[in-house]
Amino acid sequence: GAGAGIPSHTHLNKLDEDKLLGLGDQKFSLVYYLSVGDQSCSEPGVLKFYEPDEELLPEEGMVVIFPAGRKHSAVYGGEKKRVIVGINFYAL
């Protein structure tokens, strides 16, 4: 809803970080944007990636797949509802 946001984070857990198993390199995150909400506001829900820094302004119907270990964040300050589907998966 309005004012929603997620501070910078990754989607790796302790098991993913076990170097012996090596699962972290095979884990990915997917975001599917069903509704991007109000992008005319000051915080339009930009998906920010870190190291290297990149910004992506989502569009309805867009699918973004990235390594689960990549630090990212998103802040949305619009009044309209924003609807996304987020999934983490392993490519084994």
Question: Where do the PLM segments sit?
Answer:
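Catalytic core of non-heme Fe(II) oxygenases with the double-stranded beta-helix
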Residues: 1-76, 81-84, 88-92
